[in-house]
């Protein structure tokens, strides 16, 4: 938190809700980075995943401090984040190390389209951008609805195999299966997506 945020009296007197949220964020995965840029809150980001591709300028502007399963713990600590944001049990060891070093860590575990929107809202709220976040999310939901309606007119639904990774084989991801359905396709392995 900023110095202002550490002074509860200043917060109580302020109408600026963004001061309550984290001011120095490290994003261990790509999604929070892209979302914070869309919210116009990129100034808060002090470190990103090396896998970040959107927006392209993030790779030029922000130091890369993590892969998906590993992180440069010393570099993250040097950046003095007041919040580190990660994803799923796969980053639990990273989160545990950072918590033991006294850092605030928020791990999301979004697995479905609804959970992705929930994560997006929570992150928008963390940085005082609930209204902007809701507006962006509504536009995205309207696009998904339009795609779904257009897909409903297709004469046939193609069966789709989606492989996220080849070694080990990773398939059957719930949100991917949902998106395939929205777009008019059927996941080849819906039973795997149901377990994800």
Predicted regions and their residues:
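N-terminal ligand-binding lobe of clamshell/alpha-beta domains
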Residues: 1-196
């Amino acid at each position: 938190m900023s110095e202002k945020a550490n002074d509860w009296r200043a917060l109580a007197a302020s109408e600026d809700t963004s001061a309550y949220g984290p001011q120095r964020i490290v994003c261990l995965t790509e999604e929070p980075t892209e979302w914070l840029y869309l919210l116009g809150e990129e100034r808060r980001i002090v470190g990103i995943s090396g896998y970040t591709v959107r927006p392209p300028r993030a790779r030029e502007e922000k130091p890369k401090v993590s892969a998906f399963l590993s992180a440069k713990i010393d570099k993250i600590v040097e950046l003095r984040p007041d919040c580190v944001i990660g994803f799923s049990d796969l980053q639990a060891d990273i989160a545990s190390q950072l918590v033991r070093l006294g850092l605030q860590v928020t791990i999301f575990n979004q697995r479905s389209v609804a959970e992705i929107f929930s994560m997006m809202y929570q992150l928008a709220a963390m940085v005082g951008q609930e209204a902007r976040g809701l507006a962006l999310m509504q536009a995205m939901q309207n696009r998904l609805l339009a795609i779904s309606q257009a897909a409903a007119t297709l004469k046939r639904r193609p069966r789709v195999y989606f492989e996220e990774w080849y070694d080990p084989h990773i398939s059957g991801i719930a949100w991917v299966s949902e998106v395939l359905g929205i777009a008019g396709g059927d996941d080849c392995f819906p039973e795997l997506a149901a377990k994800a």
